[in-house]
């Protein structure tokens, strides 16, 4: 297939499973160089020779194959960069994550790809997701290894959620052992993200891998509900899309009508999780309970044999409740509001 088809509609090209006739070249009237690195992997770099000041930005979507809206947004980002409609001010790696699951219209084929990073894919060698996790790790590591010394590194991993949420759009920051940066929290505010969830333990997500192993300012964005390709109201994603485009193009954060910057998001910290011990797990919440629903002290939320989870703080909120996960995996997170102390500690 010609390279123009790749750049004009990255999503359709990737779903078709073709390799481009040319795997690198120039676009945007010669202002941008591009390189196809494999299925769903596309790198861009400005042609101008001012590399020392450039940030390196990885933007990903489709780590879950049925989370279509961010995939569509990324395809439009590629189109606009290639056409010169959006300037490029950074090194950029665009990633469509679980391409076979995207083609099948499924979240994943064998295993949740976003639980297989930081080497965990080696524990499930028969999984169809395992080679892709290893490939995405290698691509990210190579991309950030080539970053100019001392330059900014970002990873924005865009998702949509299975269920409704008290905060429709929220972010998750991986645990790195240090407080979140002001740059990230302010960028999330500019993206109109209402809430941020801080992990307190290491994980196996894509954003955790890039934060820990590549030194990136990384986040997972949850931007709304899962819908099939072509059925998304992309206007609902406009603030996040604008923020990503500004990050890529070197634009400035928005200023509101009063001359100030957008409000910072509320911050919640993970204080525990419900782990599925067996198929006997019972979650005592409604099947359609929204993410960030609050529960009072003393509420029993789960039972699995001798295991029971009871709320011990004045208020805890549940995020990602899912009793259908495989035994050994997380069936829900419990978080508390830590906005004041987190904002005070920003660096």
From Swiss-Prot:
It catalyses: N-succinyl-L-glutamate + H2O = L-glutamate + succinate. Gene3D superfamilies: Zn peptidases (3.40.630.10). One of its GO terms (molecular function) is zinc ion binding. Pathway: Amino-acid degradation; L-arginine degradation via AST pathway; L-glutamate and succinate from L-arginine: step 5/5. Pfam families: AstE_AspA_cat, AstE_AspA_hybrid. Its EC number is 3.5.1.96. Keywords: Arginine metabolism, Hydrolase, Metal-binding, Zinc. Its cofactor is Zn(2+). Zn(2+) binds at residues 64, 67, 159. Binds 1 zinc ion per subunit. Disulfide bonds: none annotated. The keyword Hydrolase applies. The active site is at 222. One of its GO terms (biological process) is arginine catabolic process to succinate. It comes from the Bacteria. Transforms N(2)-succinylglutamate into succinate and glutamate. HAMAP family: Arg_catab_AstE (MF_00767). Belongs to the AspA/AstE family. Succinylglutamate desuccinylase subfamily. NCBIfam families: arg_catab_astE, PRK05324.1. PANTHER family: ASPARTOACYLASE (PTHR15162), SUCCINYLGLUTAMATE DESUCCINYLASE (PTHR15162:SF7). This is Succinylglutamate desuccinylase. It comes from Burkholderia cenocepacia (strain ATCC BAA-245 / DSM 16553 / LMG 16656 / NCTC 13227 / J2315 / CF5610). The gene is astE.
């Amino acid at each position: 297939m010609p390279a123009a088809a790749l750049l004009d509609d990255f999503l359709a090209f990737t779903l078709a499973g073709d390799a481009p006739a040319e795997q690198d070249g120039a676009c945007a009237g010669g202002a941008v160089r591009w390189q196809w690195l494999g299925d769903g992997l596309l790198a861009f770099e400005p042609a101008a020779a001012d590399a020392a000041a450039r940030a390196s930005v990885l933007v990903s979507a489709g780590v879950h194959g049925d989370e279509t809206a961010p995939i569509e947004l990324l395809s439009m980002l590629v189109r606009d960069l290639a056409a010169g409609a959006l300037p490029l001010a950074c090194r950029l790696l665009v990633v469509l994550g679980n391409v076979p699951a995207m083609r099948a219209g499924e979240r994943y084929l064998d295993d949740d790809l976003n639980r297989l990073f930081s080497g965990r894919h080696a524990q499930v060698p028969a999984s169809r997701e395992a080679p892709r996790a290893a490939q995405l790790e290698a691509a990210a590591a190579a991309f950030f290894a080539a970053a100019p010394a001392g330059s900014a590194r970002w990873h924005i991993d865009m998702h949509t959620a299975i269920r409704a949420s008290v905060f429709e759009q929220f972010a998750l920051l991986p645990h790195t052992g240090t407080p979140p940066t002001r740059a990230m929290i302010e960028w999330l505010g500019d993206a109109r993200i209402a809430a941020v969830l801080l992990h307190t333990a290491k994980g196996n997500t894509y954003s955790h891998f890039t934060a820990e192993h590549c030194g990136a300012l990384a986040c997972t964005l949850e931007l709304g509900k899962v819908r099939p390709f072509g059925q998304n109201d992309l206007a609902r994603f406009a603030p996040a899309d604008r923020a990503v485009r500004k990050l890529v193009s070197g634009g400035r954060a928005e200023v509101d009508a009063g001359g100030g910057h957008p409000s910072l998001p509320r911050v919640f910290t993970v204080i525990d999780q419900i782990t599925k011990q067996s198929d006997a797990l019972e979650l005592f919440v409604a099947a359609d309970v929204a993410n960030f629903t609050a529960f009072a002290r003393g509420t029993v939320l789960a039972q699995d044999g001798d295991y029971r989870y009871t709320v011990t703080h004045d208020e805890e909120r549940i995020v990602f409740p899912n009793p259908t996960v495989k035994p050994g995996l997380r069936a829900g997170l419990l978080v508390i509001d830590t906005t004041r102390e987190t904002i005070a500690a920003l660096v």
